[in-house]
Structures are given as structure tokens and as C-alpha cells.
């Protein structure tokens, strides 16, 4: 790729076709995709109903800008609101969703201090990068946006010591996906919510990777009983088409009037056509129940087959967002699995991150378990011989 900035460490395969969980490279080799395009293709690759919805919209109109009313935006926003008094700002990505959330929080509260957490990841544009609690993401870019502070995740005493009446917002993930697939303790999150209310700070939950069925409910925070002031979506909202959404309680409306924020392509009709069909699918009776049944099946097999291995130190996560912490580096495991036809990711140097489509079959889960076990056993033998 001679004409593209090398901002990504790319795997040496070029994927040209995908259906469901199966993708094919330009040489005709097939793989089970347990990355879902980094938690994007929650309904699998090229789902027929989503493709048909986009195709229909392609024949009508593609783009009008946000200078005009758009019934499709309102329809999708209503589906996202899920029966609650919520308003939506549409954009194109997760980092844009988080930027919008940060702007809204500061404008509504009139305060600047924002608390996030160590090992968090919220994006790579300046505001969301400043919110990200990882020094390696900050390196080389000079002074960050002022006003951000980071505290240890799951440490309520450290958080209690940091939050005060000058805090505009607290931004967090219910599972730190990029940071190592680290779930939050429910009691910790509930106490964070209470302290936010006490101090007049807004609670922002980044659901870019955990939302839209990935962890077993439409939004990950629902499992804990949280009621965030703002939450953010992207990734699975478009199943591969670029769309993001910042979702806020309706009483925040006074801070986001005309001119306060904008996006040329945000809420474009092609992406919205996909999002509407995706949300309708996820809200079908039995859909999430089936996702949870398969996720439980997968987790049980992972624990039964991998916990006994000496090079596996932990299996954690929720739903179809799973982390496997290894005693050794994850990269050799990723490479051998790819060679054998299974695509997964890392989350740090020694954590495997597994993100199958929510539509994965039981047979595909069985095949992935077989490959994971055999490769980890091979790696263990190799390390012992070395």
C-alpha cells in the first residue's frame, strides 16, 4: 500500500468477500471472522435485509445535508431512544460521537473538568484522544485538550477523591475493550453514578464497542441498572456503513441548539437506512435471547477447554466481547490462528480479544474453540521446548 499513510499495522491479507461469519481473501482462502471488523459487523457480513434497505435508499436520494428535515433521522432516533426521553445527534464514527458528548457536557454544565479512567479508549481526534487514558495514544501530539484527569478503573476511593463540584462529566466504558477487555465492577459503576448526581456532573457512557447487542443487551449499561445522562454509539449501528450517534437526556436540549455542533455527513440517508434495519432486527422478539444463549455456550466452552492450559491466565468480558489473557505475547497466537483460518484481535500485548458476529452459528463457535485450543496448545509446547 504505497500511497496510504502507514497508521495501521495491517495483517497481510486482503479480504474481498464476506457473508455472515465467513470472509474470503483475494487468493480464495476463507476465514472465520471473529473480529466483526472490530465489533462493527454485529449482524455478520453483508446481511441481506440491511443490503436491501440500503439498495432501496440508493435508488431514491443519498445526501441532502442537515439543512432540511429528515423523517428517517427521527425514525432511527426513536429506535435508539428505546422508549426513553432521549435526543440524538448523528455523526459518522465513535470518536465523533464522543467529541459531541464532551462538547455537550461542557456547554450544559458550564464546567470544564472531565474525569475518565486509566486504560480507557475513546478515540483519536483531539478531544476524545485527551479523554483516552493511555499515554501511548497521546505521544507526539503536543499539549492535549486541558481539563481531563484520569483515575484507576474500578477504584472507587480514587474516584471519590477526584470528583468535585467543578466536574462537568465522567466518561467511562462498562467494559474497557481496547484497554484489555476489563469489565467494570457493578458496585463501582453504581457508586460512580451516585457521586455524579451528588456533584452535578454528567455521566457519559461510551457504548461504541459494548453497545448494540455486543454484550447481550441493546446497551451494555442496561445490565447494571445505570441511567446515563449521555451515551455514545457507532460501530454496530451501521454494520460497516459509517454512522455514529450521541444520545442525551432530553433535558440537555437547551445546550445543543442551532450552531452548537454539526456534521456534514452525519445522519446521511444511506447510513440511516442501514441503521434502521439493524435496530429493527435487534429489537425482534427473541433476537437478543438467542445472542445470549450462544454467548453463554461460547463462554462455557472457552472456560472448559482453555482454563486448564498453563498459558491462559484469565477469561473475561461479557456477551460476545471476550478477552483471554495469556502468560505470553498474544501476537504469535493471532498469527497462527490466522494461518489456520480464524481471525481474532489483541487488546494489549498479551490479551486475545474475540468479537464474533452476534449471528454466529453454534457450528462456527465449535470450530473456533477447536482452533483456539489447538493453537494455544501448540504455543504452549513451543514455549516449553524453547
UniProtKB/Swiss-Prot annotation:
Binding site for pyridoxal 5'-phosphate: 94-95, 121, 206-209, 264
N6-(pyridoxal phosphate)lysine modified-residue sites: 235
Subcellular location as annotated: Cytoplasm
InterPro entries documented for this protein: AcOrn/SuccOrn_fam, Aminotrans_3, Aminotrans_3_PPA_site, Class-III_PLP-dep_AT, PyrdxlP-dep_Trfase, PyrdxlP-dep_Trfase_major, PyrdxlP-dep_Trfase_small
Cross-referenced SUPFAM superfamilies: PLP-dependent transferases
Alphabetical UniProt keywords: Amino-acid biosynthesis, Aminotransferase, Arginine biosynthesis, Cytoplasm, Pyridoxal phosphate, Transferase
GO BP annotation list: L-arginine biosynthetic process
Catalytic reaction annotation: N(2)-acetyl-L-ornithine + 2-oxoglutarate = N-acetyl-L-glutamate 5-semialdehyde + L-glutamate
Enzyme Commission (EC) number: 2.6.1.11
Cofactor binding remark: Binds 1 pyridoxal phosphate per subunit.
Gene3D superfamilies in UniProt: Aspartate Aminotransferase, domain 1, Type I PLP-dependent aspartate aminotransferase-like (Major domain)
UniProt entry tagged with the keyword Amino-acid biosynthesis: yes
Molecular function terms, GO-annotated: identical protein binding; N2-acetyl-L-ornithine:2-oxoglutarate 5-aminotransferase activity; pyridoxal phosphate binding
Enzyme class: transferase
Involved pathway(s): Amino-acid biosynthesis; L-arginine biosynthesis; N(2)-acetyl-L-ornithine from L-glutamate: step 4/4
CC terms in the record's Gene Ontology section: cytoplasm
Residues where N(2)-acetyl-L-ornithine binds: 124, 263
Cofactor: pyridoxal 5'-phosphate
HAMAP family: ArgD_aminotrans_3
SUBUNIT field: Homodimer.
NCBIfam families registered for this protein in UniProt: argD, PRK01278.1, PRK02936.1
Additional facts recorded: May also have succinyldiaminopimelate aminotransferase activity, thus carrying out the corresponding step in lysine biosynthesis.
Family designation: Belongs to the class-III pyridoxal-phosphate-dependent aminotransferase family. ArgD subfamily.
Record's protein name: Acetylornithine aminotransferase
Originating organism: Listeria monocytogenes serovar 1/2a (strain ATCC BAA-679 / EGD-e)
Gene from which this protein is expressed: argD
Amino acid at each position: 500500500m504505497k500511497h496510504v499513510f502507514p497508521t495501521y499495522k495491517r495483517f497481510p491479507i486482503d479480504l474481498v468477500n464476506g457473508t455472515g461469519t465467513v470472509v474470503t481473501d483475494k487468493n480464495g482462502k476463507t476465514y472465520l471472522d471473529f473480529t466483526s471488523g472490530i465489533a462493527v459487523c454485529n449482524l455478520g457480513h453483508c446481511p441481506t435485509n440491511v443490503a436491501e434497505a440500503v439498495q432501496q435508499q440508493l435508488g431514491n436520494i443519498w445526501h441532502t445535508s442537515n439543512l432540511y428535515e429528515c423523517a428517517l433521522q427521527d425514525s432511527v432516533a426513536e429506535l435508539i431512544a428505546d422508549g426513553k426521553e432521549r435526543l440524538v445527534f448523528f455523526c459518522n464514527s465513535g470518536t465523533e460521537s464522543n467529541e459531541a458528548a464532551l462538547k455537550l457536557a461542557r456547554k450544559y454544565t458550564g464546567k470544564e473538568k472531565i474525569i475518565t479512567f486509566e486504560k480507557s479508549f475513546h478515540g483519536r481526534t483531539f478531544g476524545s484522544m485527551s479523554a483516552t487514558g493511555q499515554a501511548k495514544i497521546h505521544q507526539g501530539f503536543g499539549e492535549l485538550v486541558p481539563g481531563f484527569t484520569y483515575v484507576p478503573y474500578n477504584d472507587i476511593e480514587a474516584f471519590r477523591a477526584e470528583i468535585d463540584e467543578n466536574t462537568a462529566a465522567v466518561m467511562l466504558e462498562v467494559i474497557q475493550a481496547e484497554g484489555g477487555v476489563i469489565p467494570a465492577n457493578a458496585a463501582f459503576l453504581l457508586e460512580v453514578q451516585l457521586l455524579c448526581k451528588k456533584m452535578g456532573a454528567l455521566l457519559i457512557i461510551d457504548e461504541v464497542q459494548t453497545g448494540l447487542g455486543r454484550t447481550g443487551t441493546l446497551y451494555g449499561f442496561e445490565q447494571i441498572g445505570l441511567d446515563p445522562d449521555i451515551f455514545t454509539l457507532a460501530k454496530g449501528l451501521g454494520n460497516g456503513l459509517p454512522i455514529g450517534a450521541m444520545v442525551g437526556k432530553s433535558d440537555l436540549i437547551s445546550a445543543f441548539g442551532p450552531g452548537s455542533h454539526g456534521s456534514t455527513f452525519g445522519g446521511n440517508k444511506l447510513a440511516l437506512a442501514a441503521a434502521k434495519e439493524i435496530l429493527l432486527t435487534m429489537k425482534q422478539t427473541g433476537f437478543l435471547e438467542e445472542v445470549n444463549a450462544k454467548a453463554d455456550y461460547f463462554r462455557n466452552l472457552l472456560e472448559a477447554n482453555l482454563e486448564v492450559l498453563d498459558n491462559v491466565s484469565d477469561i473475561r468480558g461479557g456477551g460476545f466481547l471476550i478477552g483471554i489473557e495469556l502468560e505470553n505475547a498474544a501476537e504469535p497466537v493471532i498469527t497462527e490462528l490466522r494461518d489456520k483460518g480464524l481471525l481474532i484481535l489483541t487488546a494489549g500485548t498479551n490479551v486475545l480479544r474475540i468479537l464474533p458476529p452476534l449471528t454466529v452459528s453454534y457450528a462456527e463457535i465449535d470450530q473456533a474453540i477447536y482452533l483456539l485450543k489447538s493453537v494455544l496448545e501448540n504455543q504452549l509446547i513451543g514455549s516449553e521446548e524453547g
